Amino acid sequence: MGRDLRDNETWWYNPSIVVHPHWREFDQVPDAVYYSLGIFIGICGIIGCGGNGIVIYLFTKTKSLQTPANMFIINLAFSDFTFSLVNGFPLMTISCFLKKWIFGFAACKVYGFIGGIFGFMSIMTMAMISIDRYNVIGRPMAASKKMSHRRAFIMIIFVWLWSVLWAIGPIFGWGAYTLEGVLCNCSFDYISRDSTTRSNILCMFILGFFGPILIIFFCYFNIVMSVSNHEKEMAAMAKRLNAKELRKAQAGANAEMRLAKISIVIVSQFLLSWSPYAVVALLAQFGPLEWVTPYAAQLPVMFAKASAIHNPMIYSVSHPKFREAISQTFPWVLTCCQFDDKETEDDKDAETEIPAGESSDAAPSADAAQMKEMMAMMQKMQQQQAAYPPQGYAPPPQGYPPQGYPPQGYPPQGYPPQGYPPPPQGAPPQGAPPAAPPQGVDNQAYQA
């Protein structure tokens, strides 16, 4: 039985909204699916707006969090906040409970356009965060000098322009925005197989999805490698450091290891959130079209919209200064996220205090401070090694010792003989000048 579109085509504002014929081939999904989807999207929207709203409030009101690197987190939180507000609750939630898109064709295009902008913005902002953290870990001594508020602002402007570039194409005929899945939300048209739609999908996949994936993988792979190398260097230096320096080095290594674990979580969350969309779009273009059912098309929507919840948890709650700020302002938020005392102590030990006279543009992040402290200790050890031998030490003359010295077979085998008593304590070596005579004794008489 074909799908009854009377409950899924909108008759408000614009009755000519386009529904791709592909979706007519499937039966209408049960009401329970609509209601479950509406509840899920509503919960994601409310939590996404609340969580990202708290992140934006704290990062803008807490001076210690207003560093250049944290501008990316604020931009990500703003992107996810808007994504949850417009593309989740209430538009899609209302449509799911009514079992049809009720907001018309123009609203469908605006909905898809906003979803495209902030979807691409979240992906590219995560790539910018990975670049910043790669600079902090891979080049810690130069990280605080290179990243400033101006540089971070320029990178964020690039992210916005990049996102608008890919989202605006369907508005002007390069692809299209249309209903998808259970016909309660709008997105890119990935079902049509004409050349315009296919080129749009391929370009978005390669440059809008796969490109940021390569950036994120490259940066976090090098972060993990840097963590491994620093741990080996710290182990080699441990014996030469005093107790205070060793404690700071161990704290920095612990902070690095936590950062590496967070990096793995970030990559996994990124793939979990956005890979299903990419797979379904490519499958619709190059695979069996009958595999793209309403259920298969709606699952990526759920994963992508849930990413607005993951991001503030991963990028913000893992930040030690953010945890401190949120515990003072909203202590109830962290009741489910307990951090042991050792982790908090390591974070404090690993951070370097910023002098009051420094400009806020050059203020390093906590990660940069940790790495600068470790690199300073490593440079100190390298300077000590470079200062040996001491200045003024004359090297031995060329050709010394002479070739063939000592002679082969020297000392002779069995020398000294077994049982040979050692010389008495204080005895002068053979050939040494005679000792001075006691006080009051004539030297010639003493030697005679």
From Swiss-Prot:
The modification N6-(retinylidene)lysine is found at residue 305. Contains one covalently linked retinal chromophore. Upon light absorption, the covalently bound 11-cis-retinal is converted to all-trans-retinal. After hydrolysis of the Schiff base and release of the covalently bound all-trans-retinal, active rhodopsin is regenerated by binding of a fresh molecule of 11-cis-retinal. InterPro entries: GPCR_opsins, GPCR_Rhodpsn, GPCR_Rhodpsn_7TM, Opsin, Retinal_BS, XYPPX. The chain crosses the membrane at residues 34-58, 71-97, 110-131, 152-172, 200-224, 262-283, 294-315. Keywords: Cell membrane, Cell projection, Chromophore, Disulfide bond, G-protein coupled receptor, Glycoprotein, Lipoprotein, Membrane, Palmitate, Phosphoprotein, Photoreceptor protein, Receptor, Retinal protein, Sensory transduction, Transducer, Transmembrane, Transmembrane helix, Vision. It is found in: Cell projection, Rhabdomere membrane. Residues 392-437 have a biased composition (Pro residues). The keyword Glycoprotein applies. GO terms for molecular function: G protein-coupled receptor activity; photoreceptor activity; retinal binding. Residues 59-70, 132-151, 225-261, 316-448 are cytoplasmic. Gene3D superfamilies: Rhodopsin 7-helix transmembrane proteins. Residues 343-448 are annotated as: Disordered. It is a multi-pass membrane protein. It comes from the Eukaryota. Glycans are attached at residue 8. PANTHER family: OPSIN. Photoreceptor required for image-forming vision at low light intensity. Light-induced isomerization of 11-cis to all-trans retinal triggers a conformational change that activates signaling via G-proteins. Signaling mediates the activation of phospholipase C. Subsequent receptor phosphorylation mediates displacement of the bound G-protein alpha subunit by arrestin and terminates signaling. Belongs to the G-protein coupled receptor 1 family. Opsin subfamily. This is Rhodopsin. It comes from Todarodes pacificus.
